[in-house]
Structure formats: structure tokens, C-alpha cells
């Protein structure tokens, strides 16, 4: 099993050792080089936002400003400047509908997001270093493709895959209570100033983890770490994968799977969470001696797993075809292809590349869209965007020199 490696020594420039508990993390959060590196990580994909452009123009001054905010954010009783203290804003929720689901998202301000990135840069080696290797989603380098490869290896080995169990957590993010997460954090982080900084970030969310906050996904994953290891080590389940709040377990013994689901339900109850009522234990598909196929495929992480192949869920295929038809319609009307739509289409083709759905691609996609042409358009438009961005940056630098 490959465990996610994160070299904090390269990021923060200080020696780092894996420990049971960690101290002096607040000192790291106050360092200028850490704050600057957090900004570089934060700005990816957000360079068009005006507040980010303003911060980048005068980065050194903004780094000192964030440093002052963190230095003045301490528990009551410590001498600080109350005007410079970190004061989070109360956000209005944004409702987003995607893939048939309605999600409530909160968009943090640049200062909030910056401080969250500083916190995560320090928490990442602690959380990712001790995480269960087969927990995927919301960790860098651990997407659905890595989870798909893991389940494929189980099936190819042929051991411990007679029966499967699947379960989801009901409204996971909206039911996580921060006080429960904090108790778990206190065992690992022995730094009251650093914990107070996290407390301030979560001021307006005592009974939920806000979607849209960079800190939320890390704290949510940290909350389920102990349960992951219990399933594998205490219950001795043959195979176990967690994709954020979705559990997929495999074992030859069906009774063990039922006991595992009961244990998961009990532990979730202690954390004030609930398992969905649509949990299931079923026999994995196989061929009988008479040649008749029985059992079911496994549907997890957007993939459909069979003994000899891996397919994609229907709604993802429909989504790919819908975008292909949009691009085809724009080509027929002689309209310009939007860069975001082209990038989204090429990204979704990765699902087809890593599954046995090439025949579907030939019938439904190839006749509508020329993929090579789309890739050339992306390359050309990206060069144009980068050139204009470079020209704008040069103009701003010249203007600032004239002003000086």
C-alpha cells in the first residue's frame, strides 16, 4: 500500500518528525515563508479574481498583514490588538445543483481562505500521514481513479471478494459537530494557540462542516480515521475502501460484513452521525457451473465493477454525451468554443480512458466531436490567456514604478 507522502521540510524549511502529538504549530503559522507558500497554493485557479490580483501586486505587504492577523488571534487573556484580530465574516449560503443533488456552499473571503491554507499546510502531514491508505477523495493524489485501481486489484486477486457491503453517511458535512472534531484534534495537537485559530475559522459553524471551506474536507477526513482502522484491524474485514462518506467492504464471510455495518452504525451514532437506510450486503457477480450468471456488480466512486471489466455509471456517460452535443452544436453554428467547456470535456474523457467503454465512445462521442481539434483549441486559447496575463502583469509593474 502506498501512503501519501508530504515533505513538510521542503514546504516549511524546518526538520519534521512523525509523532503521536505535535506542539509549536502556531509558530509555524506565523512564519512569513509559510504564509507566502500558502498564498501560492491558494491562488491556483483563482488568478482572475480581483482581490487575488490586488494581493499578488503587493504580496509582501499582504503577507505581513496576514502575519499580524495570526499573531493577534489568541485566546482571551493574552495581550493582543483587537482591531487586528482575525474576524470571520458571516456568509450567506449559495445553493448549487449538480448531478441531481442540491448542495449548500459557503464562499470564504480571500483572507479566510488564506488563513485556512496556512492551517492546512501545517495539518496536512499530520492528517495525511496517519490516514488509512485506502481512504480516497479530498486528499491530493487520492482520487476515484486510485480507488478504482485498488478494487480492481482485489477482483484480480480473487481473494475475499465473494460478498460486498456498501453504506453511506447521511448528510455527512451538514451533521458534523465541530466540538467532536476538536476533541479528536486535541489528542494530536498540543498547541492551544493553533487550536484557537481553527476555532475562529469555524466560529459560525458549530454544528456543520461548511462546503466550500478548504479546512472542512481535512477535518471531515480526520474525524473518520479511527473508524477506518477499526474496520480493518479490529473487525478483520478482508478489503475496505472509504470514498469520503461512502464505505465499500468486501469479505467471503457475509456475517462479518453484517457485523461490520452494525459496528459502523454504532460508532457513527457516538459521533452524532447516521448511516443511510439504503445500506446493502450482496453476493458479487459470478458464473455458475451451468453457465448462468448470478449476483451483482459493485457500484462505487462512479464506476461499475464486474469480474472481467470496469464500466462507468450511466449519469456520467450522459453528462459526457451532453457536453459533446453542446460542442457539436457550437461547431455547426460557427460559434467559438468556450475554454471551460473544452477543458471539462477533455477532463471527463479520462473516465473513458480508464474503463472498458471505448465502444460506447465510438458510437456516441467520436461522430460528434474531434478530440484532437478540441485539444489544439485548448492549447491555443491557454497560450493566449497566459500571454494577456503576462502583458497585464508587466503593465501593472511599470505603472507601480512610475508611481514610485
Language-model segments: which ranges?
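Active-site-proximal segment of RNA-dependent polymerases
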Residues: 8, 12-25, 116, 120-177
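Short, glycine/charge-rich beta-strand/loop segments that flank catalytic centers
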Residues: 57, 89-100, 132-146, 170-171, ...
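Conserved pre-motif C helix in the palm subdomain of viral-like polymerases
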Residues: 101-132, 206-232
Amino acid at each position: 500500500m502506498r501512503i501519501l507522502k508530504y515533505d513538510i521540510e521542503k514546504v516549511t524549511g524546518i526538520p519534521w518528525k512523525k509523532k503521536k502529538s505535535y506542539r509549536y504549530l502556531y509558530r509555524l503559522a506565523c512564519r512569513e515563508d509559510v504564509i507566502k507558500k500558502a498564498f501560492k497554493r491558494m491562488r491556483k485557479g483563482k488568478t482572475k479574481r480581483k482581490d487575488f490580483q490586488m494581493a499578488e501586486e503587493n504580496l509582501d505587504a499582504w503577507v505581513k498583514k496576514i502575519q499580524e492577523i495570526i499573531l493577534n488571534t489568541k485566546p482571551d487573556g493574552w495581550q493582543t490588538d483587537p482591531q487586528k484580530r482575525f474576524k470571520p465574516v458571516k456568509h450567506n449560503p449559495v445553493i448549487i445543483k449538480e448531478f441531481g443533488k442540491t448542495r449548500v456552499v459557503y464562499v470564504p473571503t480571500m483572507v479566510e481562505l488564506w488563513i485556512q491554507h496556512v492551517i492546512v499546510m501545517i495539518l496536512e502531514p499530520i492528517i495525511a500521514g496517519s490516514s488509512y491508505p485506502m481512504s480516497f477523495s479530498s486528499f491530493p493524489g487520492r482520487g476515484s481513479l486510485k480507488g478504482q485501481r485498488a478494487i480492481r486489484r482485489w477482483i484480480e486477486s480473487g481473494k475475499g471478494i465473494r460478498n460486498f457491503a456498501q453504506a453511506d453517511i447521511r448528510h455527512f458535512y451538514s451533521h458534523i459537530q465541530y466540538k467532536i472534531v476538536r476533541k479528536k484534534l486535541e489528542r494530536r495537537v498540543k498547541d492551544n494557540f493553533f487550536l484557537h485559530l481553527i476555532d475562529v475559522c469555524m466560529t459560525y459553524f458549530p454544528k456543520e462542516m461548511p462546503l466550500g471551506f478548504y479546512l472542512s474536507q481535512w477535518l471531515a477526513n480526520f474525524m473518520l480515521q479511527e473508524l477506518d482502522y477499526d474496520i480493518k484491524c479490529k473487525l478483520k474485514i478482508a478489503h475496505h475502501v472509504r470514498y469520503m462518506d461512502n464505505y465499500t467492504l468486501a469479505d467471503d464471510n457475509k456475517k462479518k460484513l453484517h457485523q461490520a455495518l452494525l459496528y459502523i452504525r454504532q460508532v457513527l451514532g457516538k459521533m452524532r452521525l447516521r448511516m443511510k437506510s439504503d445500506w446493502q450486503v450482496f453476493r458479487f457477480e459470478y458464473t455458475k457451473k451451468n453457465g448462468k450468471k448470478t449476483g451483482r456488480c459493485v457500484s462505487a466512486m462512479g464506476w461499475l465493477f464486474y469480474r472481467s471489466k470496469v464500466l462507468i455509471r450511466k449519469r456520467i456517460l450522459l453528462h459526457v454525451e451532453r457536453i459533446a452535443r453542446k460542442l457539436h452544436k457550437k461547431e455547426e453554428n460557427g460559434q467559438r468554443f468556450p475554454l471551460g467547456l473544452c477543458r471539462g470535456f477533455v477532463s471527463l474523457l479520462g473516465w473513458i480512458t480508464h474503463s472498458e467503454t471505448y465502444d460506447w465512445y465510438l458510437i456516441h462521442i467520436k461522430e460528434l466531436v474531434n478530440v484532437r481539434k478540441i485539444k489544439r483549441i485548448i492549447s491555443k486559447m491557454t497560450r493566449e490567456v497566459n500571454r494577456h496575463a503576462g502583458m497585464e502583469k508587466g503593465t501593472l509593474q511599470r505603472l507601480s514604478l512610475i508611481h514610485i
